[in-house]
Amino acid sequence: MEPSLIDVRRALHRIPELGFEEYKTQTYLLDLIQSLPQDFLEVKTWKTGILVRVGGRKGEKTVAYRADMDGLPITEETGLPFVSQHEGRMHACGHDLHMTIAFGLLRHFAYHQPETHLLFIFQPAEEGPGGAKPMLDSEEFRMWWPDEIIALHIAPEYPVGTIATRKGLLFANTSELFIDLKGQGGHAAYPHLANDMVVAASHLVTQLQSVVSRNVDPLDSAVVTIGVIKGGTKQNIIAETARIEGTIRTLSIESMKKVKKRIEALVSGIEIGFSCQASIDYGSNYCQVWNDEERVARFIEYSQGREGVTFIECSEAMTGEDFGYFLEEIPGFMFWLGVDTNYGLHDARLNPNEDVLSFAVQHLIGYIETL
């Protein structure tokens, strides 16, 4: 007897793994895929990801569907009977649901051959360091290059049955931010003989609050958030080093350039003002998610005409998603899928309504069959 969608989701929820470490997840999915009829399936692996091609009856084009695979470094607090078995790891962004929906679609089309070719993409490392771009550039992917591509992301705030998306920009440009400061440590009783990097970091964090408000057009939008400050070893030792970690998010590419330029100027000022050395690392950078207008309009029209579906034309979000790299080269779209839970993405208590699994699979089967 084949597992239900809920069974699959719960099995995946128990084994969350970080980016490019999704070995158990890959093995579990491959076992599921191998249990399906193989008459028109072809399977490739890339690192910890999986590509599955479903040969269509006509095969005039290839439609791709992408699901991300990785979990987050979060200790789960849901208290569910299928809680994460990996300490300090959790599917707190819904990727367990994303994979389950993709498998549900794949299973349907393994039994019911589609008109067109389909490509199912199980992509590792969306949360970091970023799996989309290297997967897109891989030989394995380029052998099965699709003509269009689709993806979704769960939305805790919307009820089950809700689809939300928009033409054009959906998600922001994002960049990590790491700033390291190095000065001169010393005894707390002799501050004049040291260069205190805790004080320097504190000044810099305060200055960073003006980057958006005084440099970005108020009709545009940007965010600079500092999430971590590290510095010092003991209460009576002046810190020799400090580290600031944060994120930058902008709706426009120009604003991203402007924000980074301003941050670099402020860091240079800190170097002069506190006689220290500083370095900046932008870590992972994700480009914007830009929905192809023609294709997303077709999906919107389809969704609005379906009984039991509530469609919302949403605003842009500051969310980061490496699916944007696929959309840079392949026309397609992404949409929000309501999962009706009180807790947000990346929350240790996130508990999506599992009724969404069958809803999403049936909705997407119907849409794909129109292509």
UniProtKB/Swiss-Prot annotation:
It catalyses: N-acetyl-(2S,6S)-2,6-diaminopimelate + H2O = (2S,6S)-2,6-diaminopimelate + acetate. Pathway: Amino-acid biosynthesis; L-lysine biosynthesis via DAP pathway; LL-2,6-diaminopimelate from (S)-tetrahydrodipicolinate (acetylase route): step 3/3. One of its GO terms (molecular function) is N-acetyldiaminopimelate deacetylase activity. GO terms for biological process: diaminopimelate biosynthetic process; lysine biosynthetic process via diaminopimelate. Pfam families: M20_dimer, Peptidase_M20. Keywords: Amino-acid biosynthesis, Diaminopimelate biosynthesis, Hydrolase, Lysine biosynthesis. InterPro entries: AcetylDAP_deacetylase, Amidohydrolase, Bact_exopeptidase_dim_dom, Peptidase_M20, Peptidase_M20_dimer. Its EC number is 3.5.1.47. The active site is at residues 68, 127. Catalyzes the conversion of N-acetyl-diaminopimelate to diaminopimelate and acetate. Belongs to the peptidase M20A family. N-acetyldiaminopimelate deacetylase subfamily. This is N-acetyldiaminopimelate deacetylase. It comes from Halalkalibacterium halodurans (strain ATCC BAA-125 / DSM 18197 / FERM 7344 / JCM 9153 / C-125). The lineage of its organism: Bacteria, Bacillati, Bacillota, Bacilli, Bacillales.
